[in-house]
Amino acid sequence: FGPSGREDAVREAIAAIAGEYIDDVTTDALGNLICRKKGSGKKVLFAAHMDSIGVVATYIDEKGFIRFSQVGGLFKGDLINITVRFANGTRGVISYEEKTPFKDLTLDNLFIDIGAKDRADAEKQVQVGDFAVFEAPRFEQNGVLCGPYLDNRIGCVTLLRAMEQVGETDNDLYFV
């Protein structure tokens, strides 16, 4: 789980691994993980991002449907019937108001159905401000790893491998 602004679990996992290879591991005020391999030469920065796209609950209507806003770039038409998972494990499916022509979809026409009978029931599971990520299976097929957010996390893995391989260096290296 690691939508933009809520990457704590991802950051902690990366920091635990990076600590074996790096001199300093810190987090700045914005939540960036900064891993430093000390050197006396030039400062060199290697960067990757650990967040993922998702949604944030903005309103719960009287029917218990959760209205949401996007976190990152989303294509509205691709969201229909997609499963999302909130940090507390609650799952829901994105749907849209039946009267809306598909070509006219906006976030205002979409909602997350968690199976709640009404607003009070929904609020027992999800609060306004809760983040959710898109849930899809991870699997290996024909020697290839498939799954969501790999485009985001492969950069982190690459930086971890670089930290592991770098050894001693004259330059001051920053992995962010």
What kind of feature is each model-predicted range?
Residues 2-176:
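N-terminal hydrophobic/helix-forming segments and targeting peptides
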